Amino acid sequence: MSHATGSRAAGATTACKVIVGMSGGVDSSVTALTLLEQGYAVEGLFMKNWDEDDGTEYCTAKEDLADAQAVCDTLGITLHTANFAAEYWDNVFEHFLAEYKAGRTPNPDILCNREIKFKVFLEYAEMLGAEKIATGHYVRQGWRDGHCRLLKGLDANKDQSYFLHAVPEVAIARTLFPVGEMEKSEVRAIAERHGLTTARKKDSTGICFIGERRFSDFLKQYLPAQPGVIETPEGEVIGEHMGLMYYTLGQRQGLGIGGLPNHPDAPWYVAAKDLERNVLIAVQGKHHPLLYTDSLSTEPVEWVAGQPPAPEARLQAKTRYRQQDVACHVRVLEDGGVEARFDEPQRAVTPGQSLVLYDGDICLGGGVIRSTWNHSEPRGDSAA
C-alpha cells in the first residue's frame, strides 16, 4: 500500500516522529519544513484519494506527487505514498452522490477530513510508528479544562476551521498545524527563502475529484439528469432546468432566463427546489425575500469536544466557507441536531451544507443543514 523514498532526518531516533500529509502544495511543504526546524523527526505521506483513469488533464495527482517528492528531497525526509481511493469512495463519494440525488448540496471536503485525513491517514501513520500527524490546514489548537480545542487560523482569510469542524477532539489533539499560526504571505515567503519548488504554486480550489472540469459534466457520469421546468413562486413557467442536482440556492448563472414579457429586466436567482414535482423555483433580484431565512435545523451535530456547551446558547455561526460569523441563538434538539435562529436573516442558506458554530475563535462543531424557514413557513425539507 505504501512505498518509501528518500532518507530520514538526522536525530529521528530520539525525536517525536511526525508524519506530514504532503499534498504537493506550499502549505504542507512549509509544515514539514517548520516541524523539522522545531526538532521533530519528520516524514511525509502523499495520499491518493481518487483513481482517475479517464486520461484527462483534470486530475493533478501525478504532478502533485512529483512536487511533494521534490520538497521531501530538498528537506532530506522520507516520502511514503498510500492509496486511500477505496476508503474515499465508500466513506465520502457515495454519500456525495446520495445527497445530490436527494436534491441537497453536500460538502465532500468536510467528510473527507473526518473520514480520510484525520482517520484513515492517522491510523496509517500510527502503523508507520508516528506519534503525531501534521497537515497544512489553517487552524490552531488550544487547551481549556483539559480538552483540546479547535481554533480558527491566525489568517482570517485562510481559516479552514469550517472544513475541520467534524473532526473529533482525539484526532485534533494528535495533529500539529504549524501554518495555522501564520499568514499565507508568510508561508510563501518561507518557502521562497528555503528554495522549495512549491513556493509559488497556485492553491488548489474546488472539489478535489472534479478539478477544473464543468461540474455538470462530471456529475452526469454518475447520476442521470432529470430535466424539468423553472417556475416563479406564483407557478408561472419561465424556463427549463437540466436537473435539480445542478443548481444550488442563490445561484444566478446558468438559468437561461431572460427577456420575458411582463417581467422587469433583472437577474433571476434560484430560490427553492420542489423535489416532488421536479421544479426549480426562481425569483428576480439578489435580495428577494424568498432568498432569505432566519431559522434552520440540522442533522445531529458533530461536537469537537463530544458534547454541546449547553442546551441553549448564544453563539456565532457560518453556513458556508468564508462567510463572516453571524450571531444566533442555538437550541439542542432531542435527536442531537440543533435549531438556530439568526439575529439577521441569512441569504441562500442551503440544505446539505453545514452550519458550523463558534464561541469566539473556538470552533465548537457543526451539523448538516436539514431544513430552513423564515418566520413560520418551513421550506427546507421538501423545497431544499
From Swiss-Prot:
Disulfides per UniProt: C112-C208
Record-level GO cellular component terms: cytoplasm
Entry EC no(s): 2.8.1.13
One Pfam family linked to the record: tRNA_Me_trans
Name of the gene: mnmA
HAMAP family for the chain: tRNA_thiouridyl_MnmA (MF_00144)
Role of this protein: Catalyzes the 2-thiolation of uridine at the wobble position (U34) of tRNA, leading to the formation of s(2)U34.
Catalytic activity: S-sulfanyl-L-cysteinyl-[protein] + uridine(34) in tRNA + AH2 + ATP = 2-thiouridine(34) in tRNA + L-cysteinyl-[protein] + A + AMP + diphosphate + H(+)
This protein's name: tRNA-specific 2-thiouridylase MnmA
